[in-house]
Amino acid sequence: MAFEEAIKRVFMKRICMKCNARNSWKAEKCRKCGYSNLRPKAKEARA
């Protein structure tokens, strides 16, 4: 169960598409630049 908790802590973030800042999962807009286009953090590594 601890592994699932770690996964949740690491990946339950939103990334700003403008400045790449990490934001909380509940965020509506970026904490650094105020941009509202946030994506979920990628769970799979890109090739």
Curated annotation (Swiss-Prot):
MF GO annotations: structural constituent of ribosome
Keyword Phosphoprotein in annotation: no
GO cellular component: ribonucleoprotein complex; ribosome
SUPFAM superfamilies: Zn-binding ribosomal proteins (SSF57829)
UniProt KW Ribosomal protein keyword: yes
Keywords recorded for this protein, A-Z: Ribonucleoprotein, Ribosomal protein
Domain of life: Archaea
Gene Ontology annotations of biological process type: translation
InterPro entries given in the database record: Ribosomal_eL40_arc, Ribosomal_eL40_dom, Ribosomal_eL40_sf, Ribosomal_zn-bd
Family the entry assigns: Belongs to the eukaryotic ribosomal protein eL40 family.
PANTHER family on file: 50S RIBOSOMAL PROTEIN L40E, LARGE RIBOSOMAL SUBUNIT PROTEIN EL40
The protein, known as: Large ribosomal subunit protein eL40
Native source species: Methanococcus vannielii (strain ATCC 35089 / DSM 1224 / JCM 13029 / OCM 148 / SB)
Gene coding for it: rpl40e
